[in-house]
Amino acid sequence: MRSIEKAVTGNKVSAIDGGERRGPISMDHIASVADRADALAHEIRARVMAPDVRKLAPNFTVAQAVRLSGLGDEPAGASWAAAHGHQRRAISVAEARSAASRNRPAYQRPSSRGAITIAVANFKGGVGKTTTAMTLAQGLSLRGHKVLAIDLDPQGSLTTLFGIVAQTEVTEGMTALPLLRGECDDLLPAARPTYWDGVDLVTAAPMLFAAEFAIPSRQTQADGTNFWRLLDYGLASARDTYDVIVIDTPPALSYLTINALMAANGIVVPTPPTALDFASLAHFWQLFADFRGNAEFLRGGGKQYAFIHVLLTRVDQSDVAMPAVRGWINAAYGEFVLPAEIPKSTVAPAMAAAFGTAYDIGAYDGARATYRRIIDAYAEVTTCVEHSMVAAWKALQQKRDAETKFPLASGHADACTAR
């Protein structure tokens, strides 16, 4: 935090001066403000990440590695922990992933199945959507899964969390834009390795906003293009390469969001338990449900999901209204609501200011209980989602077995359903 304070020293704009401005504001003036803000953002990022500039993954203690990789719940994992417990050395992300993959075979993707695609979505901003996508990617990778993270938000917040400056380091070929424009039919070449072992990234930048114009224009072409299936079709190779695909979506019902929802096997909807967020979430589901009224969406039997999870985020136990709103959410969404919750914590904003998450902390400088509370919450969410992934793979296998045994009764399954 001190590095951030130093970064803005001498660059503050007087609030009094700003308040005294009179007269019209030209586009040139807006452009100069944008340039100033962009320069300051670059300076802050450079200071926070100096001297390496690039983010580095943390190292964990043996106890942390066991807890975050799910090894503590497996007999073989417990043996691994016992074998390493006497060693007072750091465990890398790669080592934790390798141990999880070897010692948790029941949770790994069957070779005959494709990746589970998860869209993290909410039409309202500020609900913890990007942080949820990032921590899911990190948490699932620590469980031994190979993860592809896709940033579909032109703001590029997920890209920034991976330590990449969207405005200057991202090219079109690193985004989903060429796919959505029809310049290619495979998103896999856009994926790039990241600082976090086991997680690759398809980045985003403001240029991705052009997709909001390109997608509907493709629908007017006479080639039978379905605008809501562009991303789904482009993920075929990625589904054979990765175990799970996590998509961060824009906070709006945009063409990009629709493509993410139509490509997904499962959806995670983060929401704080406040009255305003509850009302906004109701609109989300209503608009989402309106898809069923579109005859074109229903071709092939309709879209189906393996799981949908509503995740309570930024849960403030000191908020007297919170229990009531939590009750509303449980009453409205029932089995969709995850038992795990993300508490409001001083850790999350501190890490966000440093362009990171709770998983990026190897050693926490503050109260140990504070860190344990937030990291254990994210780990519990990861466990819930992983169980849903495993169940989806098993259900799909049973469905395929039934279709093989009774081919005449199987019908024609929608290509968008869980793979």
Predicted regions and their residues:
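The alpha-helix within a helix-turn-helix
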Residues: 66
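P-loop NTP-binding core
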Residues: 1-63, 74-79, 83-419
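Core residues of bacterial helix-turn-helix
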Residues: 69-70
